[in-house]
């Protein structure tokens, strides 16, 4: 089981995922009624669209941090070294697609962040929020690395 520690999910909803792991290799949540900032929603849409177009990952919410994996899937993974946490989820779904692992998705409730802060955002100029340029650079770099692994 994988989830974040920022309390944006109700851990009791794992009961929605557990019965499905008997039939699927990966059970992935997708956020309903997202409680994220507009910039984060926009970034997520771009990210999911890019992974769908570039790698055929047809998952509603790749980075939803509420997932259940069969041990066999992760044991077979050959993760790229030093991949950022944001792209590792895509790498898992790309691997699953290539190796014909089964995936299903379950809607899970999403709550405002109660701890920590998103590294993908920087705030300045009177409270305006912008995308952290380092995050964009790492995303592009890691996407190219995954593309090389997949296509070359």
Regions found by a protein language model. Give the residues of each.
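Acceptor/aglycone-binding surface of glycosyltransferases and processive sugar-polymer synthases
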Residues: 1, 8-86, 113-130, 134
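Hydrophobic helical membrane-anchoring modules
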Residues: 81-152
């Amino acid at each position: 089981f994988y989830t974040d520690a920022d309390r944006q999910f109700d851990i009791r909803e794992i009961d929605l995922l557990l019965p499905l792991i008997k039939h699927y290799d990966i059970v992935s949540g997708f956020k309903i009624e997202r409680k994220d900032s507009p910039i984060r929603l926009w970034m997520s849409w771009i990210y999911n669209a890019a992974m769908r177009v570039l790698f055929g990952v047809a998952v509603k919410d790749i980075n939803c941090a509420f997932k259940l994996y069969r041990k066999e899937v992760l044991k077979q993974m050959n993760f790229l070294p030093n991949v950022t946490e944001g792209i590792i989820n895509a790498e898992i779904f790309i691997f699953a697609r290539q190796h014909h692992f089964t995936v299903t998705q379950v809607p899970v409730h999403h709550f405002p962040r109660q701890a920590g802060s998103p590294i993908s955002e920087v705030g300045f100029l009177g409270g305006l929020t912008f995308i952290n340029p380092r995050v964009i650079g790492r995303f592009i770099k890691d996407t190219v690395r995954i593309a090389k692994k997949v296509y070359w």
